[in-house]
From Swiss-Prot:
Record's keyword terms, sorted: Cytoplasm, Nucleus, RNA-binding, Transport
Functional summary from the UniProt entry: Functions as an U snRNP-specific nuclear import adapter. Involved in the trimethylguanosine (m3G)-cap-dependent nuclear import of U snRNPs. Binds specifically to the terminal m3G-cap U snRNAs.
Species this protein is from: Gallus gallus (Chicken)
Compositionally skewed regions (Acidic residues) per UniProt: 73-90
GO biological process terms on file: cytoskeleton organization; protein import into nucleus; protein tetramerization; RNA import into nucleus; snRNA import into nucleus
Region (Necessary for binding to the m3G-cap structure): 211-333
A GO term for molecular function: RNA binding
Main location: nucleus
GO cellular component assignments: cytosol; NLS-dependent protein nuclear import complex; nucleoplasm; nucleus; plasma membrane
Superkingdom per UniProt: Eukaryota
Cellular compartments annotated: Nucleus; Cytoplasm
Interaction with m3G-cap structure: annotated segments: 129-131
Name this protein carries in UniProt: Snurportin-1
Amino acid sequence: MEELCAALAGGVALAAPNSPAAPHPRLSAYKGRGDRLGQAERRRRLLCLQRERRLDYVNHARRLAEGDWAGVESDEDGGEDGDGEEEMEVDAGRRLPKRYANQLMLSEWLVDVPVDLEQEWIVVVCPVGKRALVVASRGSTAAYTKSGFCVNRFPSLLPGGNRHNTMNEKVYCILDCIYNEAEQTYYILDVMCWRGHPVYDCQTDFRFFWLSSKIQEEEGLGEKSRINPYKFVGLQNFPCTSESLCEVLTTNFPFEVDGLLFYHKQTHYTPGSTPLVGWLRPYMVPDILGLTVPATPLTAKPDYAGRQLQQIIESKRSKKLAAGKAQPSAEAAARNGHYELEHLSTPQPANSAQGQEEAGSQMEN
């Protein structure tokens, strides 16, 4: 477990380069501290590393499902992550040690377009919502924030998720979801464990295929009921060919679209930010990927996109006046610039008071 914890901690350290908490590097004049190795090179190194490394994900999944951390040094929950994204009201009694923090695989901005994008990548269209770690085990289903706080506990028709479908303690599920409060729906983005079988070290294309087939086997999972008060709905994935992406951008999805996640097919599920998962807003696709796409509601640039550069300039100017520095840090700019923050909601229209204050992304990419 010590090796696994160290590896997971290393994965989180990748969050700085090209973080979606700041503007897309190719769509603004703001210069962060940069990506010294380059996104393409870091992708290559991570693919090599995951082939060489085999971690004890069986035991890790069991600990998450059962909450059994005996024999593991406690990482007590003193202090927050410091990035202020968790504004939910969480009962002090429901706070857990940081074991459940940083368990989700997060993206970076897609900056260096992969040369093998069409052959080796797949894309998932993501609804507006909050990322959630969902654990169904021992007759109950729990939803955790990225920071590891339990914000909901309820029955579900997930294997191990309610008292009626839990035959033994080895039946449990661990899912990466996007929760949409308005729809009372958990959109299943990825799977880490199903019926006690961990798939952390399986490739993305297999995980997605396996997840889709397992969801279809669970009757009633996509409907609200007394023992399934929240719907669980799988998200489709698509090829990254030019034709497929154009078709995706003209599709009328049954939810409000937040953005696109691009997954390398060979990516293992690794907690923390990784260049093997890229994030783009739909309107960015023509500029970043160089595609000619039809004019649709998804590809229309929102008002806040044009305001980003001005916000960055104003943020820099205020920082110079306040601290006498040449340029603010990426973290400070993200706090003060009010642009595409990683953990806030997709901005309201420009005439909305809330929209003028917060132009960001609700999904923790």
